[in-house]
């Protein structure tokens, strides 16, 4: 085969430093748009972006020559710098979670990310994160999972 045709969908989640509410609600739509532009500039296909004041979800397709860790580093570093330029003392927590998404689940994962505000009226980030790890079969140590 002379060409590559990857379509690996990845749902990534990362939290703010110490899961503090560092992303003001009024700036969130601008941050999501900014992240979309950063992704586009690095040939990352960002399909969905959303979150709350203390964490972010992104659904993306990576270029075939980019490791996931590099994509996350690009998104986290650029968004941290941009939030700092907005006058916010900001940092992301170290690390991230990443989950593969089947094409058949694309619309439900997109809806899940779009509805973060409503979702978090019923469940906090810690509960959500643990549930995502369990649902995906990711082994974790409860003492260390959230830093």
Identify the residue ranges that each predicted region occupies.
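Basic nucleic-acid-binding interfaces
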Residues: 1-147
């Amino acid at each position: 085969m002379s060409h590559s045709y990857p379509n690996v969908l990845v749902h990534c989640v990362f939290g703010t430093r110490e899961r503090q509410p560092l992303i003001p609600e009024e700036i969130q739509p601008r941050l999501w748009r900014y992240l979309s532009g950063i992704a586009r500039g690095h040939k990352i296909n960002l399909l969905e972006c959303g979150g709350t004041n203390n964490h972010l979800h992104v659904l993306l397709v990576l270029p075939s020559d980019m490791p996931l860790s590099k994509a996350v580093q690009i998104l986290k570093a650029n968004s941290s710098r941009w939030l700092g330029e907005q006058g916010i003392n900001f940092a992301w927590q170290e690390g991230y979670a990443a989950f593969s998404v089947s094409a058949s689940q694309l619309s439900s994962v997109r809806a899940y990310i779009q509805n973060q505000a409503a979702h978090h009226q019923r469940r906090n980030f810690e509960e959500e994160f643990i549930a995502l790890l369990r649902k995906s079969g990711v082994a974790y140590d409860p003492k260390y999972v959230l830093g």
